[in-house]
């Protein structure tokens, strides 16, 4: 009886300070939420073992500091990433406007071979805040930005109320696995002559 190979996926979470990156990570991995998180210094990560589409996966989720003074640490943390999650607070327009900077910073620091097809994900967090009355970024506006960047999958989330957190990270995992498989098609030492290569396309939502 053969043993399934376990894949290690490195996921980077980026966004301004205070948008809920640490809360999302902890809600997904540990199923808990607290308001007492201290600001992340540098970077931290948690791991979670899951099975998606009959594949065993170890998720290594990196939560990086949102402060500009820590962006210079990026190259060491971003390299080898299989997926990048961009997070903004729907109640903070500036955090949404800064997504362009975070995406560009990741591409510069991580240097993915095919940036246009690298699996990004965008999460609009804190949709529960004040019953939605303090919202500054509409779902329509967020989806339009994602569409302009190559149809990046978008989820609206609440780390506090555990809304869409599991679904978002499951989609993240699938897109990262799909990207990993497609990249293998371009690696001479990884070509399986018995496998028919499927047409490459932008990873969508699950």
Swiss-Prot record:
Binding positions for GTP per the UniProt entry: 15-22, 63-67, 125-128
Subcellular location, record wording: Cell membrane
Source organism, top-level taxon: Eukaryota
Record membrane topology: Lipid-anchor
GO molecular function, one term: GTP binding
Keywords: Cell membrane, GTP-binding, Lipoprotein, Membrane, Nucleotide-binding, Prenylation, Protein transport, Transport
S-geranylgeranyl cysteine lipid sites: 205-206
Biological process annotations from GO: protein transport
Main subcellular location of this protein, as a coarse class: membrane
GO cellular component: plasma membrane
Protein role: Protein transport. Probably involved in vesicular traffic.
Name assigned to this protein: GTP-binding protein YPTC5
Organism annotation: Chlamydomonas reinhardtii (Chlamydomonas smithii)
Record gene name: YPTC5
